[in-house]
Amino acid sequence: MNKTFEKLGFYPADILLPKDQDMTKWAVVACDQFTSEPEYWQAVEEKVGKAPSTLRLILPEANLKAPNVDEYISGINAAMEQYLKDGVFRTLEDSLIYVERQQSDGRIRHGLIGMVDLDAYDFTPGSGALIRATEGTVLDRIPPRAKVRRHAPIELPHVMLLVDDPDKTVIEPLTAAADTMEKLYDFDLMQNGGHIRGYKLSDKQVDAVAKALEGLA
């Protein structure tokens, strides 16, 4: 791995991707969405059925206060173990993925999937940590999240980092090169979620990202 990443708090990661699955059923929105709309999650449940899905690997915040939340968490950990045992995943070692997510309104959001150094993160207001929160943290949501992770063999984090890059040095070169990159996935998202594509960065592109981020640090 490029040593430059060590001072950035953001790294390439070993990323798990499902093999030979219905990707529309596999991918669901982040657990902190539609918290007051249980009907949305019920529709997702009906869409997924018995297919392998990240729905089985997350705890939607709509269920945080459910009376059977401990049972729900045990089911999540069991599903993780079963998916690993069944060989559901393939591993992209030490990788970054460039993502283009087309929203239902046609707008495209661009991003980069990697790994965040949580030791460099602090959600305390006014913190000077390398990685800081952009909004307030709801403390009572932490315990059930921690409980899911306590026995979890894999991670499904929902962390979004914002980068101030006025000269467009990090993402835009990847957008321009997308047609030449290895495409990892390309599918419609359920529930009118739009469309998503993912591309694996080459070693040269990973090094370029490290250099660009170092220039912004």
What are these regions (language model features)?
Residues R149, K204-A217:
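A sequence-level detector for short glycine-anchored, His/Arg-bearing signature motifs
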